[in-house]
Each structure stands twice: as C-alpha cells, then as structure tokens.
C-alpha cells in the first residue's frame, strides 16, 4: 500500500527487488532484496520493521534517516556513518554483513545483535552497546574508546582489542581465547 499526501509517501508491506534507487519516503514492513543502493542518499528516509537482504548499501548517506527495528542480512555496508541517523527509536540488527570502516560513534545500540559480521576498523567510540551480541564477528582494528559494552557477549567474537581501563566491560562475556584482546593494551604477552 502506498499513501501519498503533502508529506513524503508512506509505503507499507511492499517488496523491492534489484532496485538501484528509492524514492524518499516512510517505509514500514518492507523487504529490500538484491538491491544496489551504493552511495545513495537516504537523507530523512524512515524505515520501520524493514529487512534488507543481499543488498549493497556501502557509502549510503544516512543523514537524518530513521532506522527502527531494521534487520540487515547478507548485506555489504562499508563506510556507513550510523551516528548521522535520527537517534529516536534507533534499533538495528545484522546477520552476515560486511560493515568494515563504518562508524557507530556515540550510538545507543543497547542489545544490538551482530551475527557472523565483518567489523574491520569499525568505530564504536563513546557508544553504548551494553548487552549487545557479537556472535562469530571479526573485529580486527575495531575501535572501542569510552564504549559501554557491559553485559555484551564476545564469546565467539575474534580479533578484538578492548582496553578495560577506558571502556565499561562489567559483566561482559568473553571466551578464554579472547582474553588476549583485553590484555593487549597493557603490554602483556600471552603464550
């Protein structure tokens, strides 16, 4: 259903396949599959309860975009600046996505789920990812600085370096294999 009026269009329960452009609007309960949105401008778009599957969203401009309960699966999403999004009801989840070089600076991402994701050099500075799950995620070069990851689950994550002295990690879960990533900042050699 598409409702048009004086404001931007309101699109509900639609499926978009192999699209390369998207009209600015409010999208609710929509599915985007195999779309090529690389470098598109999603300024002030609104996505509520939407799913992006096998899409290329690299370098998409997110200024003022609203992402509310949006799930990304098998998507390429390099270089995104999530801090440019509207923070109101921001909620996202990621399943086997490539988010390399993206930024979550100061994002409130409590309970966010990352599963099987590549998070190389992602910036989590001053963000709140408490109770987040990093399941089988590669965090090589990811930056955690003044980040709240208390109660987060890193048990199957790898290649991370999180300095306990500058981040909140109380009750976070780590595997014995991940302990080196917590001690690296102290100049300690393990093994």
Model-derived features with residue positions:
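Tandem repeat scaffolds
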Residues: 2-191
């Amino acid at each position: 259903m598409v409702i048009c009026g004086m404001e931007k269009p309101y699109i509900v329960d639609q499926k978009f396949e192999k699209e390369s452009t998207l009209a600015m609007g409010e999208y609710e309960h929509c599915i985007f599959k195999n779309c090529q949105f690389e470098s598109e401008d999603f300024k002030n778009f609104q996505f509520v309860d939407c799913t992006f599957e096998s899409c290329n969203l690299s370098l998409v401009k997110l200024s003022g975009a609203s992402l509310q309960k949006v799930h990304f699966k098998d998507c390429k999403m390099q270089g995104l600046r999530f801090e440019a999004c509207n923070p109101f009801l921001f909620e996202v989840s990621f399943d086997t996505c490539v988010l390399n070089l993206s930024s979550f600076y100061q994002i409130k991402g409590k309970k966010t789920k990352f599963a099987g994701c590549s998070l190389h050099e992602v910036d989590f500075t001053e963000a709140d990812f408490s109770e987040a799950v990093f399941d089988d995620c590669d965090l090589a070069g990811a930056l955690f600085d003044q980040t709240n990851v208390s109660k987060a689950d890193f048990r199957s994550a790898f290649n991370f370096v999180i300095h306990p002295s500058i981040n909140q990690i109380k009750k976070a879960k780590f595997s014995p294999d991940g302990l080196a990533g917590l001690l690296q900042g102290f100049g300690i050699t393990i093994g």
